[in-house]
Amino acid sequence: MRVLHVIPSVAPRYGGPSRAVVDMCRALREVGVETLIATTDADGEGRLTIDLGRETSFGGVPAVFFPRQWSEAYKYSRPLARWLGSHVREFDVVHIHAVFSHACLAAAKACRASGVPYVIRPLGTLDPWSLGQKSLRKKLFWHLGVRRMLDGAAAIHYTARPEQTLAEESLGLGRGVVVPLGVEVGSLNGASGFESQGRSVESPCRSPYVLVLSRLHPKKGLDLLLPAFLSTVKRPEFAEWKLVLAGDGEGEYVESLRRLVGRQGGEAHVIFAGWLEGEKRGAALRGAAALALTSYQENFGLCAVEALACGVPVVVSPHVNLAPEIEAAGAGWVTPLELDALTRTLADTLSDAGARARRGAAGRELVRRRFSWEAIARQLVSVYEVSRQEGHASS
């Protein structure tokens, strides 16, 4: 089986969705599926340094890149659209990752023209909260082709049941399937640091710390997490604790976070570590006492699963769609997005090393049972087979 994966960008700065598609293709190839990623060279305001217009390797999997010609938000690429129009018929199924992007609309249009079934993974963008952000632009896209793209899909791939429920109830969609994302446990687990060319990669902080490992974006709830954490560490018993922000975002927003920390006199307690990849990312995860993901909306939360795979408990909001599974497994703390409640939860987390160890162990078991890439790849193969046999893209 040949499956084409189309995504607007795979640059690390875009967080979990970009990383997940590379890991997904790697896992699919392990179970015998031939994959190719088609994407753009977008990397924020810059561009990835990579060959364009011909097959190359990215993250160890085959990929073909095209220039983003304009619009960081829309990532318009006429060369990508032309390539899709000529090549989608070479694949059994096309898996489209994202919705409000030129690459996605172009892929769906090419599939409909060629009679190739396609599956859409909306990345949480069909959640009512997400649709309410920059809503005028999304309404325009909706009428320009997003609704037709969704109606023509052989399946809509959600990564958590609440994501499916919210999208289907608010938009009247059907053909939904739930297949979670996975983690490559072997790439994360280890001792206190990765061994690399004879040296150990240290965690980003020698003091005990809570880790944020994601894009620095308004939806992540950092406007509440930062003051809650800084209030907590004013207590003498928590004075040595740090909050490590391992991520990047738009310059103006990151600067606003720095100002927030400065106004509260928290510079000694908050570390802006920047985006971490590879061995440094694994070391940061394993060294953390807990990971915080206090989002206003999170369709999956790959960084939380990565933390649990390392035996690190998580503090999440109810708006992280994995929160019910985390709570049921006893793998962390689910806290309302209210300043006082979040402050109390952080104090509970920091004060009880035994609880952190128990919840971390429960999290590791949850990942073993639910988030193995091998098992997930086989679930995806079933989705592709049904899509190929029962449904072709609408013309």
Model-derived segments and spans:
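Carbohydrate-associated surface elements
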Residues: 41, 162, 182
